[in-house]
Amino acid sequence: MFNRIRISTTLFLILILCGILQIGSNGMSFWAFRDDLQRLNQVEQSNQQRAALAQTRAVMLQASTALNKAGTLTALSYPADDIKTLMTTARASLTQSTTLFKSFMAMTAGNEHVRGLQKETEKSFARWHNDLEHQATWLESNQLSDFLTAPVQGSQNAFDVNFEAWQLEINHVLEAASAQSQRNYQISALVFISMIIVAAIYISSALWWTRKMIVQPLAIIGSHFDSIAAGNLARPIAVYGRNEITAIFASLKTMQQALRGTVSDVRKGSQEMHIGIAEIVAGNNDLSSRTEQQAASLAQTAASMEQLTATVGQNADNARQASELAKNAATTAQAGGVQVSTMTHTMQEIATSSQKIGDIISVIDGIAFQTNILALNAAVEAARAGEQGRGFAVVAGEVRNLASRSAQAAKEIKGLIEESVNRVQQGSKLVNNAAATMIDIVSSVTRVNDIMGEIASASEEQQRGIEQVAQAVSQMDQVTQQNASLVEEAAVATEQLANQADHLSSRVAVFTLEEHEVARHESVQLQIAPVVS
């Protein structure tokens, strides 16, 4: 039944009951304290009223005594100063009595009887006060007979009657307050005893409920935790009820089932780990062997790369020398091309000069022809002249012979010049062909020079590339050696991992997963082959 009630609800009800009991107890205490305070205030007020009324009566008696002394001194004809002093004292006492009585009247009256008594006291005070005022006035005006016949004693007696009534009333109030305080004490004691009994019953019930609903279930939960700590995961956990403890049992059962599944998975995982570790060991051995083979191959490759680097370096040197020779040949060819070009220009100038000489010879030939014609004309004219012209005819014949010889010489020179011009033209053509050939040679040599430069650059780049490849091969060799070291370290780590797996298997072997089961777990011992080094 109690298992179906939530602990929070029960604790809430317990707190509510505690609150009700506390509020009830505090309420009773407050009621008693308030009633006592009211009684105390009433007693205090009664005492203040008694004190104020007693002081008023005492001051009134002082005033009456002073007036009586003043009347006696007046009748005995004492000095006026003494009488005046007594009168001043009497007047001051009367004024003070008025103030004191007003404070008495300002105090709240209780019931109707007290208010009536207060009014009667006020009347008797006013009467007594007026009689004393009259006595003072008569005494100051030397009406001694009126002073002596004033009914002061009667008014004083009336006030004293009211004063005594007030004393009785105040005593009655004090007695009533005392009796009420006694009753309140008895009621408080009864309530206190009742509260103690109820609290004892309540605390006993709460302790029984706490032990039944919290302590005992928590002890059971603790025993389950001890069983789980001891490795017993097969102990059944009963879940009943619907309160928070039930939720803890349900969570504990869920935790037990989860632990059972976890331990089972760990067992399976440790076995699979052993298998995987064995495969890793085999793979490490294989990898170690291949790494060593790769290291040997890389060493051979590094040696070959060194030889290739030396050969390529020699080729690069030869290519640089060939490039220098090609540069020199290109320079020489360019110089020859310049000289051939100069020769071509000179042959062209010679051809031009020969043509000019031919033109001059043609002019000379024309002149000789004209001279021959003129000589012929002169001979004709000399023949006509007869003997006078015979000498002129001889001269004309000589001139004609000279003209003929000049024309013949001019023809021969012209033939020679034409032959020379033809040969010069042929030489110029040959020089032009030689110049074109030299240009082709210079262009070819320049291309050869460029190609040799490119070959030299390529050889240098190839040498640098081969050096980088050799360096990379050397680094690969170092990395391979490091990999071999890592493989050895991995083998050691694998062996340690196998030991840890064995330790893990031995640790989870203490758990009992099923009831009446004795957990036995055979560790798989891995035969780790040594890594080939």
From Swiss-Prot:
The record's annotation in CDD domains points to: HAMP (cd06225), MCP_signal (cd11386), Tar_Tsr_sensor (cd19407)
* Keyword Transmembrane recorded: yes
This chain's protein is named Methyl-accepting chemotaxis protein IV
The gene for this chain is: tap
What is stated as this protein's family in its record? Belongs to the methyl-accepting chemotaxis (MCP) protein family.
Q: Name one Pfam family in it.
A: MCPsignal
Spell out which residues are annotated as carrying Glutamate methyl ester (Gln): 293, 300, 307
Instruction: List the SUPFAM superfamilies hit by this protein, alphabetically.
Output: Aspartate receptor, ligand-binding domain (SSF47170), Methyl-accepting chemotaxis protein (MCP) signaling domain (SSF58104)
**Chain ranges of the Methyl-accepting transducer domain:** 269-498
Residue ranges occupied by any HAMP domain in the UniProt entry: 212-264
Positions modified as Glutamate methyl ester (Glu)?
A: 489
Q: Where in the cell is it found?
A: Cell inner membrane
